[in-house]
Amino acid sequence: MYDISGWKHVFKLDPNKELSDEHLEMICESGTDAVIVGGSDGVTIDNVLHMLVSIRRYAVPCVLEVSDVEAITPGFDFYYIPSVLNSRKVEWVTGVHHEALKEFGDIMDWDEIFMEGYCVLNPEAKVAQLTDAKCDLTEDDVIAYARLADKLLHLPIFYLEYSGTYGEVELVKNVKAELKQAQLYYGGGISNAEQAKEMAQYADTVVVGNIIYDDIKSALKTVKAVKGE
């Protein structure tokens, strides 16, 4: 079994986006610590299965980030369950999770499942619009969500999600200083190695996503930038 606490760099692949076999091989053989499969829309059992089969040709750990109960399938190493803490809709905080547990609770392997406390900070992002996230937050607001995830809910992961735009480094630094046990994931807007390295100073795990589809070479350079190899 893999130890997620040691993951410094992960790639996130959207099953609803096209990725060539060549580029997928580059991603899986890049030295990244893991590949997360997940997206905000268009996620189906068919495209998740296609992605799973493709990734399983390689040794890299793979994780399904569950956004739709209908797209859950066995075969992944881990399953990340996001709870959008700053959503205005209870379904995205605990509602969908309750439905999943009602349907699959008896057969879940709890050693494979990790809850993520999301704080979505880009109002233009699909995930913000889908979940009706309250994004006009002060730093105190964000730190309060971090404390909620870390100290009250004891979640293993607190995820700062800027999705498509590069975040505030100082905020990431201050959030990290608040966390005692939760692992800090940062995702959003990383388009080059320098940005990845900058965020890696404070985030435990840097998530690289959109740049994979826009500039594969720049995406690959983020691995060494984060891991310092």
Curated annotation (Swiss-Prot):
CDD domains: PcrB_like
Pathway: Membrane lipid metabolism; glycerophospholipid metabolism
GO biological process terms, semicolon-separated: glycerophospholipid biosynthetic process
SUPFAM superfamilies: FMN-linked oxidoreductases
InterPro entries documented for this protein: GGGP/HepGP_synthase_I, GGGP/HepGP_synthase_sf, GGGP_HepGP_synthase
Protein's UniProt keywords contain Nucleotide-binding: no
Keywords on record: Lipid biosynthesis, Lipid metabolism, Magnesium, Metal-binding, Phospholipid biosynthesis, Phospholipid metabolism, Transferase
Domain of life of the organism encoding this protein: Bacteria
Family assignment from sequence similarity: Belongs to the GGGP/HepGP synthase family. Group I subfamily.
Description of how the protein assembles with itself and partners: Homodimer.
Name of this protein: Heptaprenylglyceryl phosphate synthase
Protein's organism: Bacillus cereus (strain G9842)
Gene transcribed to yield this protein: pcrB
